[in-house]
C-alpha cells in the first residue's frame, strides 16, 4: 500500500440513513468535488473559499433553475480530510425526495455513485488509515454498548496498528541480521544470530498470545453474547427477560407453558451486549405447539454462550430442575435462584450438591432484589480480566484473529526449527511468513481481493 495520494474520479453518496429526519448529508470526495458542488450551489463561489469552512446557500437545478433546498455546505480541501482528497458535504433538510434530488444533480454534473465503503477505502488507499482502523469505523457504527464503542475508538486511534507495526519491525530487524549471515558466512555469527532469532520469535509470540487472549471478549463486544434464559415452566423466565429489557416483551402469567416459542432481544448489561433468548419452559408435554417450543429451547441451550438457569426457591427442586442442571453443566452459566420474596421450599443443601455456590445469584424479580448482583456477575464473568477496555488493545473480528493465529503458528515453526538445529535460512522462511501475516492485519501485505471484499461490507456513504 502506498501512502501517497492517488487521483481517483469524484464520488458522491448520501451519508445519513434514509427516511425522514432533521438533516441529511450528501458527501462528495475527489479531485473535482468542489467544482461539482459549485455547479448546483447558489451562494458563495466554493472554489474561492478557505478549507474547513461552512457556507449557507441553496441547491438549484442548473438546467431548469428550480430551487431544490436550503442548505449548509462544508468544504474541506486535501490533504487534511478523511479521504485525503477534496471533500464537500451538503447538509440539507432530511427526507427522501430532496436528498435524492441533490444526489442526482451531482451525478448529472459528473460525479460517480460511490460504492459501499468507498470513502473509507480511499482513506486506506491514500494512507490515511490502515485496515485495522478501517474495520474499527464499522465496529464503531455497529457498537451496541459503551464498552464496544470504547474498543472501536481505541482501534480507530491506531493502538492495534501501532502494536502490529512494532512487532513487524522487531521481526524485520532480526531478518536483516539473518540476511547478513547468509550473504557473509565468513563472519561466522550463526550462533549469535540463531540466539537472537529465537529470542525475538518468543518475544513476538508472547505479544501475539496476549492479543489472542482478548479475542473472546472482543468477539462478544462485536457480535453480542448469546444468552439463553432457561428453566421449567412458571419459574420467572419471562419476568427476568422483561426486567432486563425494562419493557414487557414476554407474556407473564401463572399459567405454565404460556411462552411457547423462543423470544430474542438485545440488552446492554454493564457494557456487555447480551442477545437474550427467553425459551419455552422445558418439560414433558403432549401439546404439539408446546413440544416445538421445548425442542427449540433445547437447541437454544446448545447454541448459547451463557445460560441463565432460573430455579424457583418457593418450590422443592424437581426432576426437571435437576435435568436442566445436568444439561447445562458444561456451559458458562449463572443459577438464578428466584422468588426470594416467597417462603423457601427448595432444599439448598441438595442444590449445592449439584452446583457451585459461586454460580448462584438470589433474586426476587418483582422487587428487583438481586438484579444488580446478576448484572455484575455477567460483566465479571466475561470481562473480569480486562479492567479498562479504553486502554486495552483488543482484537474483535475473525479476520484479525485468524491472521494472528497463523502468525503464531509460523513462530511455533521458527522455535521448533531452531531447537531441531535446522539451517538458519530455512528457519527464516517461517519468520518471514509471520511478518507477512501481521502485515495482512494492517493491510501492508494484504491482497487486493481481500481489500475489495472487506470494504464491500460497509454501508453506502461511509
UniProtKB/Swiss-Prot annotation:
<dbReference type="GO" id="GO:0046872">
    <property type="term" value="F:metal ion binding"/>
</dbReference>
<dbReference type="Pfam" id="PF10396">
    <property type="entry name" value="TrmE_N"/>
</dbReference>
<feature type="binding site">
    <location>
        <begin position="253"/>
        <end position="259"/>
    </location>
    <ligand>
        <name>GTP</name>
    </ligand>
</feature>
<feature type="binding site">
    <location>
        <position position="462"/>
    </location>
    <ligand>
        <name>(6S)-5-formyl-5,6,7,8-tetrahydrofolate</name>
    </ligand>
</feature>
<feature type="binding site">
    <location>
        <begin position="234"/>
        <end position="239"/>
    </location>
    <ligand>
        <name>GTP</name>
    </ligand>
</feature>
<feature type="binding site">
    <location>
        <begin position="278"/>
        <end position="281"/>
    </location>
    <ligand>
        <name>GTP</name>
    </ligand>
</feature>
<feature type="domain" description="TrmE-type G">
    <location>
        <begin position="224"/>
        <end position="383"/>
    </location>
</feature>
<protein>
    <recommendedName>
        <fullName>tRNA modification GTPase MnmE</fullName>
        <ecNumber>3.6.-.-</ecNumber>
    </recommendedName>
</protein>
<comment type="subunit">
    <text>Homodimer. Heterotetramer of two MnmE and two MnmG subunits.</text>
</comment>
<keyword id="KW-0378">Hydrolase</keyword>
<keyword id="KW-0630">Potassium</keyword>
<dbReference type="InterPro" id="IPR005225">
    <property type="entry name" value="Small_GTP-bd"/>
</dbReference>
<dbReference type="GO" id="GO:0030488">
    <property type="term" value="P:tRNA methylation"/>
</dbReference>
<keyword id="KW-0342">GTP-binding</keyword>
<feature type="binding site">
    <location>
        <position position="27"/>
    </location>
    <ligand>
        <name>(6S)-5-formyl-5,6,7,8-tetrahydrofolate</name>
    </ligand>
</feature>
<dbReference type="InterPro" id="IPR006073">
    <property type="entry name" value="GTP-bd"/>
</dbReference>
<dbReference type="Pfam" id="PF01926">
    <property type="entry name" value="MMR_HSR1"/>
</dbReference>
<feature type="binding site">
    <location>
        <position position="238"/>
    </location>
    <ligand>
        <name>Mg(2+)</name>
    </ligand>
</feature>
<keyword id="KW-0547">Nucleotide-binding</keyword>
<keyword id="KW-0479">Metal-binding</keyword>
<dbReference type="GO" id="GO:0003924">
    <property type="term" value="F:GTPase activity"/>
</dbReference>
<dbReference type="InterPro" id="IPR018948">
    <property type="entry name" value="GTP-bd_TrmE_N"/>
</dbReference>
<dbReference type="GO" id="GO:0002098">
    <property type="term" value="P:tRNA wobble uridine modification"/>
</dbReference>
<dbReference type="InterPro" id="IPR025867">
    <property type="entry name" value="MnmE_helical"/>
</dbReference>
<dbReference type="InterPro" id="IPR027368">
    <property type="entry name" value="MnmE_dom2"/>
</dbReference>
<feature type="binding site">
    <location>
        <position position="234"/>
    </location>
    <ligand>
        <name>K(+)</name>
    </ligand>
</feature>
<keyword id="KW-0819">tRNA processing</keyword>
<comment type="similarity">
    <text>Belongs to the TRAFAC class TrmE-Era-EngA-EngB-Septin-like GTPase superfamily. TrmE GTPase family.</text>
</comment>
<feature type="binding site">
    <location>
        <position position="89"/>
    </location>
    <ligand>
        <name>(6S)-5-formyl-5,6,7,8-tetrahydrofolate</name>
    </ligand>
</feature>
<feature type="binding site">
    <location>
        <position position="255"/>
    </location>
    <ligand>
        <name>K(+)</name>
    </ligand>
</feature>
<dbReference type="GO" id="GO:0005525">
    <property type="term" value="F:GTP binding"/>
</dbReference>
<dbReference type="GO" id="GO:0005829">
    <property type="term" value="C:cytosol"/>
</dbReference>
<feature type="binding site">
    <location>
        <position position="253"/>
    </location>
    <ligand>
        <name>K(+)</name>
    </ligand>
</feature>
<dbReference type="InterPro" id="IPR027266">
    <property type="entry name" value="TrmE/GcvT_dom1"/>
</dbReference>
<comment type="function">
    <text>Exhibits a very high intrinsic GTPase hydrolysis rate. Involved in the addition of a carboxymethylaminomethyl (cmnm) group at the wobble position (U34) of certain tRNAs, forming tRNA-cmnm(5)s(2)U34.</text>
</comment>
<keyword id="KW-0963">Cytoplasm</keyword>
<dbReference type="InterPro" id="IPR031168">
    <property type="entry name" value="G_TrmE"/>
</dbReference>
<feature type="binding site">
    <location>
        <position position="258"/>
    </location>
    <ligand>
        <name>K(+)</name>
    </ligand>
</feature>
<dbReference type="InterPro" id="IPR027417">
    <property type="entry name" value="P-loop_NTPase"/>
</dbReference>
<feature type="binding site">
    <location>
        <position position="128"/>
    </location>
    <ligand>
        <name>(6S)-5-formyl-5,6,7,8-tetrahydrofolate</name>
    </ligand>
</feature>
<feature type="binding site">
    <location>
        <position position="259"/>
    </location>
    <ligand>
        <name>Mg(2+)</name>
    </ligand>
</feature>
<keyword id="KW-0460">Magnesium</keyword>
